[in-house]
Regions:
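Extracellular/lumenal regions of secretory-pathway proteins
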Residues: 1-199, 203-207, 229, 239-249
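Solvent-exposed loop segments of extracellular immunoglobulin-like
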Residues: 208-216
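Conserved aromatic beta-strand anchor motif in extracellular beta-sandwich/beta-rich domains
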Residues: 216-222
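Solvent-exposed, well-ordered amphipathic alpha-helical segments
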Residues: 221, 250-251
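Short aromatic-acidic-glycine turn motif
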Residues: 223-229
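Conserved blade-ending motifs and adjacent loop-strand segments that build the rim/top face
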Residues: 234-237
């Protein structure tokens, strides 16, 4: 079954005290396919798909702007870690990680649009942007210092809402157009049945399908089985396609 909801997601990772790992990392993904990357070692935004080279034909300054955006985010998250440390009663060096993700979703059938933005600190939820109200909600008391800062800047929050529901969607559609032959392709799976022993569950394995939106079910006649079935996750293959399985308990 083909997905109709497309996504553009940005992932930022800012750490302190983590050895042998970039202090800052940014990854951009379209429909869960990585399209660009930047980190504090290279300090340069770079494409991760060949078709992303097409962007500069229409926009020669694209990669310079992306690099500037990512490096600006690094400075922002540097400051946030320093602001948060006292709130969590943290002193000295130590290992600390600030992560954030934001982006948008677009349904190419219903045309419905959604946006999201959230941040986490040391592996726990910290802030979440409420799109409809255009406000930040703190997931824990220590995040209030950042939440208040956001609420005081109402214009900035409205600007974020506009970005997530307009500009982000504009770029999502643009990336989909650039990578249409890859992102919008369809590949059917090969399907096999596996059983270790006569008393073992029978596993239905489907692999090699693209895109990754799919369902796999066992049926008895027209009835879909649920209680007897243990479904597996959709997992990526090395060649960019996907696989999934569902085990049927015969006992």
């Amino acid at each position: 079954s083909l997905p109709v909801t497309h996504t553009l997601k940005y992932f930022y990772y800012r750490s302190s005290g983590v050895p042998n790992f970039p202090e800052f990392l940014a990854v951009v993904m379209v429909d869960d396919v990585q399209i660009s990357h930047c980190d504090s070692n290279t300090r340069r935004a770079e494409p991760r798909q060949e078709w992303m080279e097409k962007v500069t034909a229409d926009d020669p300054q694209y990669w310079e702007r992306e690099t500037a955006k990512f490096l600006d985010a690094q400075q922002t998250y540097n400051a946030r870690i320093e602001i948060l440390k006292p709130s969590f009663n943290q002193t000295g060096a130590g290992v600390h990680v600030y992560q954030s993700t934001y982006g948008c979703e677009w349904d190419d059938e219903t045309k419905k649009i959604n946006g999201f933005s959230q941040g986490g600190y040391d592996g726990e939820d910290l802030l979440r942007f409420k799109l409809k109200e255009a406000i930040c909600a703190a997931a824990k008391p220590e995040a209030e210092i950042l939440k208040r800062s956001g609420d005081e800047k109402k214009a900035e929050m409205e600007s974020l809402k506009y970005y997530l529901t307009h500009e982000c969607v504009y770029w999502l559609k643009k990336y989909l157009d650039y990578g249409r032959s890859s992102l919008m392709r369809t590949e059917l799976p090969s399907v096999s049945l596996l059983q270790k022993e006569p008393s073992s569950p029978v596993t239905c394995m489907a692999t090699g399908f693209y895109p990754g939106g799919a369902t796999l079910s066992w049926r008895r006649g027209e009835e879909e089985l649920h209680e007897e079935v243990e479904p597996g996750e959709i997992l990526p293959n090395p060649d960019g396609t996907f696989q999934m399985s569902a085990a049927l308990d015969l006992s």
